[in-house]
Regions:
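Aliphatic-rich helix starts adjacent to a transmembrane/signal segment
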Residues: 11, 42-57, 71
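N-terminal leader/signal peptides at the extreme start of proteins
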Residues: 1-18
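N-terminal single-pass transmembrane signal-anchor helix
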Residues: 13-41
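Extracytoplasmic/periplasmic mature domains of Sec-exported, cell-envelope-associated bacterial proteins
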Residues: 19, 54-62
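Hydrophobic core positions within the conserved protein kinase catalytic domain
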Residues: 5-8, 45, 64
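Periplasmic/extracellular, small/polar-rich flexible segments of pilin-like filament-forming proteins
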Residues: 62-142
Length: 142
């Protein structure tokens, strides 16, 4: 208790600056905030990568439906089966392009009148893989 009084007396006499205890409290608070904020930031980044992958798969399915409409309901034999990573625009067939996000790889598996599009993100190995199946019209992820 005496040391606290001495510190207060010194401060009252005009000494300026922070005490060691005050500095330690600030460092501890910053450490706690960092421990909470960093995992949240990493999860948000992963969610953004998953969202980009899902969006690219949806966009590729729209391009594929356009191609099939122009080809009598069938998937052309010359359709490109893989896009990305690193390609920003991917020409799937005859000028029908899809924009591919950074790190996303799209794989198209044609099967006559149906197809599947699988999208994965190389930015993080724990990202989801999205699969669009034209037979069901749905996107699944794992």
């Amino acid at each position: 208790m005496k040391s606290v009084r001495n510190a207060l007396n010194r401060r009252a006499k005009g000494e300026k600056g922070f005490t060691l205890v005050e500095l330690l409290v600030v460092v501890i608070i910053i450490g706690i905030l960092a421990a909470v904020a960093i995992p949240i930031y990493l999860n948000q980044r992963k969610a953004a990568w998953n969202s980009a992958t899902e969006s690219d798969v949806k966009n590729a399915s729209i391009v594929m439906e356009t191609i099939m409409t122009n080809n009598g309901g069938k998937v052309p034999a010359a359709v490109k089966t893989s896009c990305g990573p690193g390609a920003t625009h991917c020409d799937i067939f005859d000028g029908n392009e899809v924009t591919v996000s950074d790190g996303v790889t799209l794989t198209i598996t044609p099967n006559g009148t149906t197809y599947q599009i699988e999208g994965s993100n190389n930015n993080d190995l724990n990202c989801k893989t999205y699969t669009y199946d034209s037979a069901t019209g749905s996107i699944t992820h794992n």
